[in-house]
């Protein structure tokens, strides 16, 4: 949010939104990851935003800086310069634990808000007819790569946390995310 917003924590935002339903303008990419993230927040907290499609992560920063939106979900790495300059305030992070990348940003849970949301998921996908031995070789190479300290630091420097999941675990996680998205999408369409 902008540094001059009337809220600087999740509880303050929730209280403000409940007092001003539909008035807080949230910049998203409709149908994209941040849209689903916002719909998840609305469902968990009972608030309602005025959602505006403003485009990419950098477009959201421009819109917030220009006062065209009131709040945005964004990657910390994209907004970091604005946070450091004092233009933006990070309300929090929807995770169980604070991030190693931005340890000064409290979690929603720490602020008393019962809301968790999966972070940005990056993974490798191979054509479905890729032979099993090639899949296994690729997986072993990725697992070894993710143990390399230089690779881990490079990922941290980009504002992400390095993690590795086996193909089976990643497939299971994606199935859970798909189910969550389908539920959120159905609820969003029911509102329209």
Q: Which ranges hold each PLM region?
A:
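An extracytoplasmic/periplasmic, membrane-proximal ligand-sensing/linker region
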Residues: 44-45, 132-192
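Structural motif detector for alpha-helix initiation sites
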Residues: 9-10, 105, 167
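Conserved functional loop/turn residues at catalytic and ligand-binding sites
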Residues: 9, 67-68, 87, 112, ...
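C-terminal lobe and pocket-closing loops
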Residues: 78-147, 179
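Ligand-binding pocket segment of bilobal, Venus flytrap-like solute-binding proteins
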Residues: 23, 28-105
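Hinge/capping helix and adjacent helix->loop/strand transition within the periplasmic-binding protein
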Residues: 1-59, 110, 121-154
